[in-house]
C-alpha cells in the first residue's frame, strides 16, 4: 500500500511537472533550479522586477491595499505574477477568493485545503466563472503540509495544483529526500523556501488594536496597523515583526532569517524546480542582494559562506541586524527506527 502511494505521488507530480513546463516562458532556465521571490511590499516587487533573469514574482500583501497596483507593476515588467491568498478564511470571508481571482494573476498561491477544494468545485484552473473571469493556475503553499511523497501525491493527484511547496517542518536533508522519492520529473514541480523569516505565530488577537488604539475591534480601532510598524521583543532582546491581515489576524515573524544558502546546491541536485526567497520588510537594495546571491550560489558563481556573512549584516526595517540561522533546515537528527513506538499503521 505504501509503495502504491509513492508511485501515485510520482505519477501525480509528473503530470504537474508537464503542466508547469508548458507554462514557462522560453527564456526561463528549464535545466536549472529557478529562484522565485515572495514580496510583501510594492517596493520589494518593483526592485525584483528589475532583474532580467527573474521570471516570476509572488505578492503576499496581508492587507489588500496596493495589491492591484503591485500586480500591474509586475505584469508591466513582463513577469508572471502570483498572488498569495490568506491562510485562513473564516465563514464571513468567503467572498475574498473572488477578489483575488478578479485580479487575473497568472497563478494563485493556495494556502488552505478548503480554498483548494472550493476552486476544484468551481472547475479548477481554466474554468470560466459567471462574471467571465477565469480561474488561474494554482500553486500549493507550505501550509498544505506536504511532508512526504504520499502527501505530495495526494495533493497533486487531482490535477488542480501545478506546483507545490513543501512544508517548513522538514530539514534540508528531508526536503531532498522527498524530491528524490518522487523522481526527477516530479521534483520539477516542487518548491522549497530557501530564505524566510519563519511565521512563528498566527493569532486572531490584534496587538495593534490592543496597544496602539483605544478601540475594541476594526470598527473603532482606527486601523493603526496601516500607519505603524510593530515588533515584539523577547527575553533575549530579539525583535519580532508583527503584521496584520485584512481579517485583523496577526502574524509574528521570527527576528532572524532562516536560510538554505548552505543547502541550496544539495536541493538543486535533488531536483527541486524552484527555491523561494520570502521577504518580510527587507529594503529594495537587500531584495536585489538576496535574489542575486541565491542565484549565484545555485549557478556556482557565489560562495554560500560569503552570502551567509552578507545576510548576517543585513538590517531589517527597524535598523537592526538580527542575524541568520539554518533553523529547522539543520534538523534535530532522526531517531533510530527501533527506538520509536509502533504506530497504528504498524499494529
Q: Which residues does each PLM region occupy?
A:
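Active-site pocket-lining/capping segments in soluble small-molecule metabolic enzymes
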Residues: 1-158, 163-347
